[in-house]
Amino acid sequence: MSTHPVLDWSRSAEHLRRSHGVTTDPRPDEDGHYPCVLTRGSGTRVYDLDGNAYLDLTGSFGSVLIGHAEPAVVRAVTDVLSEGNLFYTGASPRRLALAERLLDWFPWSEQAIFYRTGSCAVSAAARLAQHATGRNRVLSSGYHGWHDWHLEAVPEAKPKTFESYATEFHNDLALYRSWLDRHGEEIAAVVVTPEPHRFDHAYYQELREVAKEHGCLFVVDEVKTGFRAGAGGFSALAGIEPDAVTVSKGMANGHSISAVVGQRQLTQELSEAHVWSTYQNEQVGFAAALASLDFLERHDVAAVTRRTGEAVRQGVLQLFAEHGLPVGAPGWGPMFELDFDAADEGLAERLEAALLRHGIFCDTGDDFNMMFHTAEHTDELLERFAAALGDL
């Protein structure tokens, strides 16, 4: 039986108390299950206000793919800050260079349009599709951010008078076909988020073909998978060529940038659709993305994180079995999640707290996201995981 480590979170507690009085962020601080305030990171480790160190399994919602404060990315960003970050004209050498790199990454694509967040990119893609097709409605499945068009998937967030132009088909292929058979002439686009551990490639190929049959643009929300999957994103692995993909997380190793990468039929509607903003041409994001893409390609990060993810996933499954805990770990390559459906109520919260005490920062209700540098700490990670299970 392991002993319960006692960590000092006193400075973090005072900071959280003060913060809750003047600012708020329900993700993930407000619910109180993270007693620490993270202040810096290096490689796979993050550090809190009290000086405690943790191995990071969140990858900052999956946005950090290489590792925190990767020197090559830091240097690129520092160079930009000494030159100025935002200018009135959008054209810049860095924007052009990044657009060309993205067209190489997704070789079927013709243009790239840049934004700041994944939510912005997917919302832009939906509106661009409406203008490109002259149709109004969107069929979607999966999570696409917080913007209004997607509120059909989050009914508790909808204002009382809100009417969405998007309809969720919840990955139900029969419902999807039915909607398109009955309303295909109204559907501008189908927007899907890949869930590789739940559906095979044939499923996504069928979604794509049915959309094409009805003249609907097909958009793959690769905000999380676009760079974790390697060149071509998940779309290439699935053997499909969409009309557009949206990308963000992992592209700039934690810096804010996103893009719609697609066919000119869709992207040429930019001016008429009015989907641009002041900050979409920040140089910091371009520089961070270029440096990150150099690293991803030079070190074959997708292959490394796939191997690491599978090693950690199998190790975690073995530990659960050794402790007699009915917890699954469905996943795909560089990311996996924990399945507590057959476990006792409250186990997820208890495990998360135990892991934190043993120096693993994670969210048991979300994906475990591998970073490139996680490979250097696989044994340590599993040792800490085993110690945490011993505390339950």
Curated annotation (Swiss-Prot):
Record-stated family: Belongs to the class-III pyridoxal-phosphate-dependent aminotransferase family.
Species in which this protein is naturally found: Streptomyces kanamyceticus
MF terms (GO), sorted A to Z: pyridoxal phosphate binding; transaminase activity
Functional description taken from the UniProt entry: Aminotransferase that has 6'-oxoglucosaminyl:L-glutamate aminotransferase activity by catalyzing pyridoxal-5'-phosphate-mediated transamination leading to the conversion of paromamine to neamine in the biosynthetic pathway of kanamycin B.
Catalysed reactions, semicolon-separated: neamine + 2-oxoglutarate = 6'-oxoparomamine + L-glutamate; 2'-deamino-2'-hydroxyneamine + 2-oxoglutarate = 2'-deamino-2'-hydroxy-6'-dehydroparomamine + L-glutamate
SUPFAM superfamilies tied to this protein: PLP-dependent transferases
Pathway the protein contributes to: Antibiotic biosynthesis; kanamycin biosynthesis
Name listed for the protein in its UniProt record: 2'-deamino-2'-hydroxyneamine transaminase
Cofactor: pyridoxal 5'-phosphate
One Gene Ontology biological process: kanamycin biosynthetic process
Residues recorded as bearing N6-(pyridoxal phosphate)lysine in the entry: 249
Superkingdom: Bacteria
Gene: kacL
Keywords in alphabetical order: Aminotransferase, Antibiotic biosynthesis, Pyridoxal phosphate, Transferase
Entry's EC annotation: 2.6.1.94, 2.6.1.93
